[in-house]
Amino acid sequence: MGGTFDPIHHGHLVAASEVAAKFGLDEVVFVPTGQPWQKMSKKVSEPEHRYLMTVIATASNPRFTVSRVDVDRPGPTYTIDTLRDLRTQRPDADLFFITGADAMAQILSWKNIDELWSLAHFVGVTRPGHVLDGMGRKDVSLLEVPAMAISSTDCRTRVAAGNPVWYLVPDGVVQYIAKYGLYAGHADPGPSAALTELHEPASTE
């Protein structure tokens, strides 16, 4: 499951669980983007912060893992590079790329689109009532997930306004956001400090 995860919220987790159940997936790999090319002009939290929040959010589910392939790769993040790396790591796996409705709506503008179709089956998750075009392709599936009404943008806005995000994001992520002053204009000690204090492993894979 690819995404900025800035921050990861319960909508992401429910969507991943629903897709895993529907398609009988053995594992869901969360892949936080490094430098998302679509958001180069927008402020995005440091990759290590987003990676660690994803690790915290997924730790209790044995079917969920987190990959650093995009975080560790220099330069802008493109899905084609993500899928190539995952294919190299899992040559015998049937890959499903799970992403949100907003990303699926732009998929035809993505880099190396023809190769993308050959590398994975794409699953677009959306909130009920949101119309999403499956482009008539057998390798694209659409799935409505009620919890996708939660958005990372709304979570960031709430934090910036001093409003709570409990029950929108996992408890550990709420505490992480508060500890490092994310989204509230507080001083950010940086991802290296976060790594040192949390003692997280370099990778969960």
Swiss-Prot record:
<comment type="similarity">
    <text>Belongs to the NadD family.</text>
</comment>
<comment type="pathway">
    <text>Cofactor biosynthesis; NAD(+) biosynthesis; deamido-NAD(+) from nicotinate D-ribonucleotide: step 1/1.</text>
</comment>
<keyword id="KW-0547">Nucleotide-binding</keyword>
<dbReference type="InterPro" id="IPR005248">
    <property type="entry name" value="NadD/NMNAT"/>
</dbReference>
<keyword id="KW-0520">NAD</keyword>
<keyword id="KW-0548">Nucleotidyltransferase</keyword>
<keyword id="KW-0808">Transferase</keyword>
<dbReference type="GO" id="GO:0005524">
    <property type="term" value="F:ATP binding"/>
</dbReference>
<dbReference type="InterPro" id="IPR014729">
    <property type="entry name" value="Rossmann-like_a/b/a_fold"/>
</dbReference>
<keyword id="KW-0067">ATP-binding</keyword>
<dbReference type="InterPro" id="IPR004821">
    <property type="entry name" value="Cyt_trans-like"/>
</dbReference>
<dbReference type="GO" id="GO:0009435">
    <property type="term" value="P:NAD biosynthetic process"/>
</dbReference>
<dbReference type="Pfam" id="PF01467">
    <property type="entry name" value="CTP_transf_like"/>
</dbReference>
<dbReference type="GO" id="GO:0004515">
    <property type="term" value="F:nicotinate-nucleotide adenylyltransferase activity"/>
</dbReference>
<protein>
    <recommendedName>
        <fullName>Probable nicotinate-nucleotide adenylyltransferase</fullName>
        <ecNumber>2.7.7.18</ecNumber>
    </recommendedName>
</protein>
<comment type="function">
    <text>Catalyzes the reversible adenylation of nicotinate mononucleotide (NaMN) to nicotinic acid adenine dinucleotide (NaAD).</text>
</comment>
<keyword id="KW-0662">Pyridine nucleotide biosynthesis</keyword>
